[in-house]
Regions:
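A short, proline-enriched helix->beta-strand linker immediately N-terminal to the Walker B motif
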Residues: 159-163
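Catalytic Walker B motif of ABC-type/P-loop ATPase nucleotide-binding domains
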Residues: 165-169
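ABC ATPase NBD coupling module
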Residues: 75-90, 114
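Conserved ABC ATPase signature
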Residues: 140-144, 148-150
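Conserved ABC ATPase "signature" region
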Residues: 73, 77, 119-136, 187-188
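Conserved H-loop
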Residues: 194-200
Length: 249
C-alpha cells in the first residue's frame, strides 16, 4: 500500500478475522469483521480467547486455520503468513514495556523510526498533546507512574503509523486511581484518531466508556457482536459477562 493512500485506506478498509486455534480446554473458533474506525472491544471472562485473538492478529501466534485480511492486505491465509514485524500493528500490552534506558521523548522517537508509512497519520506533537506528555518527555520510564507509562505506550503505538491498534487490557495492572486518570486520555484518543482499534477487557465499565462495538466471547466462541449501547439490554448470551455487567450497571 502506498503512503499517499494511508488516510483514505483507513476509512475504506474492512478488517476480517477468521481463526481456529486449539487451546487447553477448547478450540478458539471465531469469524468476525470489525468497523474501519473507532474502538471494538473483545469482552469476556479470563481464558475466553481474547488475548489469543490479538496475538494471532499481530502475527505473534499462528492459527492452525485462519484468515486475517486488513484492507487489501492478507496477513494470513492458507498460502500466506505475514511475519509480525511486517504487520502495520500498534500493540499495547498489559505492562507498558517501554525501553528503560531511553527517556520518554527517546521512546517516542524510536517508534517513529519503526513507522510503517512515510506519511504520518498522527504526529509527535499530536500524541504529546492527546496524552499530556509534555512534562514527562525528559524523564526515564522507571520514574513514571503506571498510568503515565501506559500513556507513553499508547502514544508510541500510534507513532508507528499502524493500520490497526491492539490494546490487551492496558489498564488491568493499574490501581483504581490510575485507571480513572488515564480513561480521559483514552476517550480523547477515541475522539481524535481515525485508526481502528481492538480493545481487550473483562471490565464492562471500561468498555462502556470507551468502545463503540463489542464482540462477546466465551470459551473460544463469539456469543454476540453488537454496539455497546445495545448490548446491556439484550444480555442472554454469556452468564459470566452478565455478572460482569451487573457489577457496574
Amino acid at each position: 500500500m502506498h503512503s499517499t493512500n494511508v488516510r483514505e485506506s483507513c476509512f475504506n478498509m474492512s478488517i476480517h478475522i477468521k481463526l481456529q486455534i486449539p487451546r487447553d480446554h477448547f478450540i478458539l473458533d471465531v469469524d468476525f469483521t470489525i468497523p474501519n474506525r473507532g474502538i471494538t472491544a473483545l469482552f469476556g471472562p479470563s481464558g475466553s480467547g481474547k488475548t489469543t485473538i490479538l496475538r494471532a492478529i499481530a502475527g505473534l501466534e499462528r492459527a492452525k486455520q485462519g484468515e486475517i485480511v486488513v484492507g487489501e492486505q492478507t496477513w494470513q491465509s492458507k498460502a500466506i503468513f505475514v511475519p509480525a514485524h511486517r504487520r502495520a500493528v500498534g500493540y499495547v500490552f498489559q505492562n507498558a514495556s517501554l525501553l528503560p534506558h531511553l527517556t520518554v521523548r527517546e521512546n517516542l522517537t524510536y517508534a517513529l523510526k519503526r513507522k510503517h508509512y512515510s506519511e504520518d497519520k498522527v504526529s509527535m506533537a499530536q500524541v504529546i498533546e492527546w496524552f499530556g506528555l509534555s512534562k514527562l518527555l525528559a524523564r526515564q520510564p522507571q520514574g513514571l507512574s503506571g498510568g503515565e507509562q501506559q500513556r507513553v505506550a499508547l502514544a508510541r503505538a500510534l507513532l508507528i503509523q499502524p493500520q490497526l491498534v491492539l490494546m490487551d487490557e492496558p489498564l488491568s495492572s493499574l490501581d483504581q486511581k490510575s485507571k480513572q486518570e488515564i480513561l480521559p486520555y483514552l476517550t480523547q484518543l477515541h475522539e481524535n484518531s481515525s485508526t481502528p482499534m481492538i480493545y481487550v477487557s473483562h471490565d464492562w465499565h471500561e468498555i462502556r466508556q470507551l468502545a463503540d462495538t463489542v464482540v462477546v466471547l466465551e470459551a473460544g466462541r463469539i456469543q454476540r457482536q453488537t454496539t455497546v449501547a445495545e448490548y446491556p439490554a439484550s444480555v442472554t448470551y454469556c452468564p459470566h459477562c452478565q455478572q460482569a455487567i451487573d457489577h457496574f450497571v
